[in-house]
Amino acid sequence: MGGQRQEKNNLDDSAVLESITSQWWSFSSFVPLVSGALWLWLAASSGLPAVLLGAVPGALLLGTGLSGLLWAVESRTFQYMALASALGGILSVPAIFVIGPVGALVLGLGSAASFLATGYLALGQHRCPASVPAPDTGPALAARAAVNELMMCGLILTSWPVVVGTIAVRVQREATEAYALFEEMNWFSEPATYHKNPPPLEEPEIETVEHRGREIERLTFDSFYEPHEDEPGRERWLSYRRNPTVCAWILRHKDEQRPWLICVHGIRMGTLNKSLLRFQPEYLHEELGLNLIMPVLPMHGPRDPGGLISGERTLSGDAMDTLHTGAQAVWDLRRIVWWLRQCEDAPTIGALGHSLGGYAVSLLASLEENLDCVVAGNPAVDPSHLFWANAPAIATHSLSAEGIREETIKALLRPVSPLALEPVVPHERRAIFAGVVDRVVPPVQAHSLWRHWDEPRIAWYQGAHQRFIRASEGREVLEETLRAADMLPEETTGTASHSA
């Protein structure tokens, strides 16, 4: 692309840990290969209903197994292998009626073995910086890695729009226009100046609802966020219905003033039930005694313009939409910080984020001086790499044909990159934790943020993406950081010694 800015990759691209892999693990690809062949053979021998039932899992297992043995493998291979294994396990139940109980049992066991093999194959390709603890290599951790591959497959397959054809042409045009504007405004060299100061949040609407025995407040307000006047994609962003209305859920103690923790969810989250599941109020609210506010990120939950799949546009490759998601997220969070401090008399305010929420609170820590501490869990600090490494090949090929590469999107997102901005939260009050076998947000992203933040406290747990604060290591580093910010008294402890 003409005039394209060459941007250095901020990620710490370390070599694969030798201690993770075994030369025999590569032969695990025989498991899905044989399982897929069995699916196709038994289905072909049992009539048309069996063929219709077994064609998809059989073809996918056979294809991904062959790919693992004969061709270069990548994240997409493991994702579709995990999908095929899960489909095979599910469809082995109705296979009882069209293939027979013995055949169905064989197919079910083969699919389960293929799922476990997927985890081992993924671990064999897992990239980790040298300072990250080596993961265990037992079947439990391999199964968690396979679950992560299945999650990522579902996330990518439900992303919208698919950047092909005219959409890829538009992405290229907007990127070209944005480069010229950002260079002119010095937003590449001074990314903090891209962000406008949001107006105070003085009178949000608050209603109280009962939810599963809890009294929860629902806070809503108009975001008032708008992209810069001449930014490409501005009118499209402003056209998304429901996104301008910010929603947040509040759990507060009514006996006295308590510290406030802003809990920011990950991608495809944003509903009340998912927020409560992820941030475990029985631990954060009841045991640690914190007031919680759980805002919904742009384009998620009740703010999703389509209303079908929460956050489907966030990792679609539509670069300007991704940029505006980050910019509006930190805008909304800064308004919430102001409201807590000025209207709720919050003595201290911290932020805890998971995945995409880890990215959002990392960005907040670079722009909001009234934030007392920040803890980023499994932070997805490089969305461009996550898209390019996992998107369907048809999308990346279409973008490449238009002159768009991973580096193009990475450079364009520099104004909303925590790896390009300097943190304003003090060093002793920022922390990171992540799983050593996270296959959704690889450990290299947390490690890169740790390096950029001058190596604050960090914790690694033996687990994958979803474990988050159920991991004792995550709870320990969270509580240490809260104490450093005077948000917990020294004698207060939660259940950091317990792991789920």
Language model segments and positions:
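N-terminal targeting or regulatory segments adjacent to alpha/beta-hydrolase or S9 domains
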Residues: 2-233, 499-500
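Short beta-strand element of the alpha/beta-hydrolase
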Residues: 258-266
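Cap/lid segment of the alpha/beta-hydrolase catalytic domain
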Residues: 265-328
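Alpha/beta-hydrolase fold nucleophile elbow
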Residues: 344-355
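Hydrolase active-site cap/lid region
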Residues: 360-409, 460
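Short beta-strand/loop motif that positions the catalytic acidic residue
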Residues: 425-426, 431-434
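Conserved alpha/beta-hydrolase "acid-adjacent" motif
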Residues: 439-445, 470
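Catalytic histidine-centered segment of alpha/beta-hydrolase-like enzymes
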Residues: 464-475
